[in-house]
Amino acid sequence: MALDLSDVKRIAHLARIETSDDEAAQTLAQLNNFFSLVEQMQAVDTTGIEPQAHPLSAVRDMVQRLREDVVTETDRRADYQRPAPATENGLYLVPKVIE
């Protein structure tokens, strides 16, 4: 996948980023280099390779020290919502700003 200058300018416009022609050209080169790298990685045949959740254990004989998945803090939602001007069902109510 390769972008052209009009793609970069359109993306910048959608993101509300003002760019000069030189900046757009530099960004185009960087994005196309990135997409080229992604295409190279996707072209690698990974058939039969098991995904690694902890890649360090494949390189070294080490055990990952993972903490227990337990709650360590109390629920303070009510405390945080008490000073709010308006809440409902645990959510903050705010004025509508977009129609």
UniProtKB/Swiss-Prot annotation:
GO terms for molecular function: asparaginyl-tRNA synthase (glutamine-hydrolyzing) activity; ATP binding; glutaminyl-tRNA synthase (glutamine-hydrolyzing) activity. Its EC number is 6.3.5.-. It comes from the Bacteria. Pfam families: GatC. Keywords: ATP-binding, Ligase, Nucleotide-binding, Protein biosynthesis. One of its GO terms (biological process) is regulation of translational fidelity. SUPFAM superfamilies: Glu-tRNAGln amidotransferase C subunit. Allows the formation of correctly charged Asn-tRNA(Asn) or Gln-tRNA(Gln) through the transamidation of misacylated Asp-tRNA(Asn) or Glu-tRNA(Gln) in organisms which lack either or both of asparaginyl-tRNA or glutaminyl-tRNA synthetases. The reaction takes place in the presence of glutamine and ATP through an activated phospho-Asp-tRNA(Asn) or phospho-Glu-tRNA(Gln). This is Aspartyl/glutamyl-tRNA(Asn/Gln) amidotransferase subunit C. It comes from Cupriavidus taiwanensis (strain DSM 17343 / BCRC 17206 / CCUG 44338 / CIP 107171 / LMG 19424 / R1).
